[in-house]
Regions:
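Mixed-charge, Lys/Arg-enriched low-complexity segments
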Residues: 2-8, 57-122
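Amphipathic, interaction-prone secondary-structure segments
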Residues: 13-56
């Protein structure tokens, strides 16, 4: 079975189904550089009602941002056409791995955020 260009297809959650019966889509793609993407199109996704896609960027399973993929400080970009998703996937594949000091900061930042119940800076 051929893989979808967006990645491996995942089962979408029932509450994300389109009210008009359209098929909900969810794909996950992992890259050798440690990045991964989750691409969705459903009733509540950014652009989903118009048939457009939302992409979330992750690094070793943690949401992250990267220039030319997401807006600064944002981990999600929406309202993407199929062609725009494919362009972003090509860019993600070419990203260099993150330096370890940045990973430690993001990890610690996540711990503080989780303990305080919000997602802010340390």
């Amino acid at each position: 079975m051929d893989s979808h260009p967006f990645g491996d297809q995942r089962v979408a959650l029932k509450f994300h189904e389109f009210s008009d019966g359209r098929k909900t889509e969810h794909y996950v793609k992992c890259f050798a550089n440690g990045f991964s993407t989750s691409v969705i199109c459903h009733e509540a996704s950014y652009g989903g009602k118009k048939g457009l896609y939302e992409l979330m960027l992750q690094y070793h399973g943690q949401p992250t941002s990267a220039d030319e993929i997401t807006a600064p400080g944002d981990t999600i970009c929406g309202w993407l056409t199929k062609e725009e998703v494919l362009e972003k996937l090509e860019r993600v594949e070419k990203l260099p791995p993150k330096p370890k000091d940045k990973l430690v900061h993001e990890f610690l930042n996540g711990l503080v955020s989780d303990q305080n119940g919000f997602y802010g800076e340390m």
